[in-house]
Design a protein with these regions (language model features):
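Helical element adjacent to the flavin cofactor pocket in flavoenzyme catalytic cores
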Residues: 162-165, 281-339
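Dinucleotide-binding Rossmann-like beta1-alpha1 core, especially the glycine-rich loop
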Residues: 95-179, 226-229, 235-244, 250, ...
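Internal hydrophobic alpha-helix adjacent to the cofactor/substrate pocket in enzyme cavities
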Residues: 490-509
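Helix-loop-beta segment of a Rossmann-like dinucleotide-binding subdomain
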Residues: 36, 136-146, 178-193, 270-303
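Active-site substrate-recognition segment that forms the wall
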Residues: 133-140, 321-323, 335-375, 379-473, ...
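Extreme N-terminal leader/targeting segments of oxidoreductases
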Residues: 1-47, 65-66, 70-71
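Glycine-rich FAD pyrophosphate-binding loop
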Residues: 64-87
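Short beta-strand to alpha-helix junction loop
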Residues: 110, 114-123, 148-156, 287-306, ...
């Protein structure tokens, strides 16, 4: 049984963080922190992990698979799952912050294809562990739906599907929609002007599409070029019904589970099942990506924490890390000496001098409605297990929760001077109102239903929008997920475990291994650039609505966002 801080009022405080924390069945009273004082040598470990989110916990999990005898200590300032890992949009997707095209430009085509396969496999691997360990986290693998609601967005959808087909990994399919909110099928035959503009968006982790993790939504390799069908798998001459997800009694495994002794290979993508309709206002078509599962993120991260504790890992909460070096982690409650140190702080790394400019803490906010009746969900057409988004530039993402709410989020909150992170920044009445308007516009059926929860939090954005994992001189790092961390953290944990233990693995040769993003510029350049970029993203959507052409603003800013 874990020890807790007696008399601590943390349970109520932490339940107020999000819908997910409010509905997790755990006691959120913090685990005991390190028992010492600053500068005192308190503990020894083989591996000390800085950060009690999914990156740190997945790393601990796979380390215990490879070597159960390892002494592993996790150090967390608040509670396990306090940050983006527990607050995101609940998309366990195959999205990666850098698009497939960007990966190819930087690392070559073969490396880009291997990275895409690794991400698709990761969705199945998370599902395998959830089932094997009995983690009750509302897992349902229904895929994600990305709606095209204008001719420009339809061109983007076609291009994304064609690009995915060219890489041969992601099994995206494009469908016209039948339903009360769908546009007339003749619109699908309209051809917008050709353009060389390329657009790709990402889902996110605090609001996971969280970059589609739920903060964020989009698909890797999303691009809008010509309106021609070149490479698209289907002609859209008439409405088609959309494939519904399979009913899953347990997460479906795409390949064999990992073993500690043999080299691991990357598997194949998945497919989907039977027909039904989707109703959304003004929607022309939808792209279905099967490589995504709906999840309750706080249940996942809290459940994973219990699993690693059962395996002998020690978690110290209420333990603020001040700094680290090879062989030692310094905290406000004493020092831990360790053979290897894992730094897994994501956006919160911006609060420490050593990593202040490594990532930019970008806020993503969410709302959740009261539960909707089954009859309303029938008219909406979103099934359990499906996540959803559309092709706008200012990202939105959502899911139907296990208790029949809309959980819906997006970008729009400004960057704060000096990369500061404060509880007050988790909430913005302006952004919350924008999210409710966006949800009601997308699904008018949601309009009469009250919003019961509002929350947000920072995710970590590297300067080149390219996540990375490193292990050098006894210090391992992982992060820069830009909201795609709900799944990418699992790949990071597996990869770091292999790097730290020296296990034979295909994962340690993936393109993101050893990648180091450049630092962000100092202020005021960082403040000006981040907020001007945010404004340009919103203007890009307005530009496309007015001109019915791909946005020039989006084209000009695309290289700054990993596309």
């Amino acid at each position: 049984m874990r020890s807790v801080v007696v008399g601590h009022m943390g349970d109520a405080r932490y339940r107020a963080l999000s819908l997910w924390h409010d509905t997790v069945p755990d006691d959120l009273t913090p685990r005991a922190g390190l028992p010492g004082t600053r500068g005192e040598h308190i503990a020894d470990a083989d591996v000390a992990i800085v950060g009690g989110g999914l990156t740190g916990l997945w790393t601990a999990y796979y380390l215990t698979e490879l070597d159960p005898a390892l002494r592993i200590v996790v150090l967390e300032k608040e509670i396990a799952g306090f940050g983006a890992s527990g607050r995101n949009g609940g998309w366990c997707s195959a999205l990666f912050p850098a698009s497939a095209a960007a990966l190819e430009r930087r690392h070559g085509r073969d490396a880009a294809v291997r990275m895409r396969r690794a991400m698709v496999d990761t969705v199945a691997e998370v599902g395998r562990v959830v089932a094997a360990e009995g983690i009750e986290c509302d897992w349902a693998a229904g895929g994600t739906l990305t709606l095209a609601r204008s001719a420009v967005q339809l061109a983007a959808a076609r291009a994304e599907v064609a690009l995915a087909a060219a890489y041969g990994v992601d099994e995206l399919t494009l469908h016209a929609l039948a339903g009360p909110g769908a546009a007339h099928p003749s619109v699908l035959r309209e051809t917008p002007r050709k353009s060389g503009v390329s657009r790709e968006t990402h889902s996110g982790e605090t609001a996971s599409r969280e970059t589609r993790s739920g903060e964020t939504a989009g698909a890797a390799g999303r691009a809008a070029g010509t309106a021609g069908t070149g490479g698209a798998p289907q002609a859209l001459d008439a409405p088609r019904t959309l494939d519904a997800p399979r009913t899953l009694d347990a997460p479906r495994t795409l390949g064999a589970p990992r073993t500690s002794g043999a080299a691991r290979t990357l598997g194949a993508p998945r497919t989907s099942g039977a027909a039904r309709t989707l109703g959304a206002r003004g929607a022309l078509a939808v792209v279905h990506d099967p490589a995504c599962a709906r999840v309750h993120p706080a249940k996942l991260v809290r459940g994973l924490a219990r699993v690693v504790e059962r395996r002998g890992v020690t978690i110290h909460e209420q333990t603020e890390v001040l700094d680290w070096e090879r062989g030692r982690v310094r905290t406000a409650r004493g020092d831990v000496h360790a053979g290897a140190v894992v730094v897994a702080l994501e956006g919160y790394g911006a609060t420490l001098p050593r990593t202040h400019r490594r990532v930019l803490p970008l806020y993503s906010l969410m709302i959740a409605t009261e539960p909707l009746p089954a009859s309303v969900w029938d008219s909406i057409g979103i099934a359990h297990g499906e996540t959803f988004a559309d092709y706008r530039h200012l990202i939105v993402y959502g899911q139907r929760t296990a208790d029949d709410r809309f959980a819906f989020g997006g970008r729009g909150a400004r960057y704060h001077w000096g990369s500061t992170i404060r509880p007050a920044y988790d909430r913005s009445d302006r952004v919350f109102a924008h999210l409710k308007r966006a949800l009601d516009d997308l699904f008018p059926q949601a309009a009469p239903y009250a919003v019961t929860h509002r929350w947000g939090g920072p995710l970590g954005v590297p300067r080149d929008w390219h996540a990375g994992v490193t292990f050098e001189n006894g210090i391992a790092t992982a992060g820069g997920y830009v909201g795609d961390g709900l799944s990418t953290t699992n790949l990071a944990g597996r990869t770091l475990a292999d790097l730290i233990t020296g296990a034979a693995s295909d994962l340690t040769t993936l393109a993101w291994v050893g990648h180091r993003s450049p630092d962000w510029e100092p202020e005021p350049l960082r403040f000006l650039g981040a907020n001007l970029g945010l404004a340009a993203t919103g203007l890009a959507d307005a530009e496309e609505r007015m001109t019915h052409r791909p946005s020039l603003a989006a084209h000009l800013t695309a290289p700054l966002t990993g596309h």
